[in-house]
């Protein structure tokens, strides 16, 4: 059976919401950054050698909330974040640091095209730094640990007709944890960092 992919490279296609989004600050503003279209962020298929004819890009505006580690999913979200950009980045529209004591919650709604009926639907993440828990329609789909590796889940059993809800909880201790990292540190310094 042909598999379909929903990509999380990760949220809404609403003109009202896109009018509300703006970069968080003016740090490292490039020509490319000024041309971001929140309704069509990074529209290209991310894995050309594995391209499928039917797929959905979930990049865009998502709801987000920052909560202490271990709390249940929020009932109310703090605002909008532009996925796939990290919360610390200007292009996320948030520009905040989290730290090891907080979880970052993402939420969005999506509808599966009717022509996908009877097909398997995969939810694919290019990477989530560092630990991610995923729910579709309040059904836990799975968990992944590792900030540099892509992963997928078959979400077919959790889908319903019409609107579906996707929730992702992320925890990243940055340099307070034991996971491998590049330049990610809580107190950046030296010649490799901009301020």
Give the positions of each predicted feature.
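Short coil-to-beta-strand transition motifs
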Residues: 53-57, 102-105
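Accessory beta-strand-rich segments of carbohydrate-active enzymes
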Residues: 63-67, 96-195
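Short clusters of hydrophobic/aromatic residues that line enzyme substrate/ligand-binding pockets
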Residues: 13, 32, 45, 81-83, ...
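Predominantly extracellular/luminal regions of secreted and cell-surface proteins
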Residues: 60-83
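Bacterial Sec-dependent N-terminal signal peptides
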Residues: 1-21
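Aromatic- and Gly/Pro-rich amphipathic surface segment
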Residues: 76-96
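Extracellular/oxidizing-compartment recognition motifs
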Residues: 26-29, 36-38, 87, 100-103, ...
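N-terminal pre-domain segments of enzymes
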Residues: 20-55
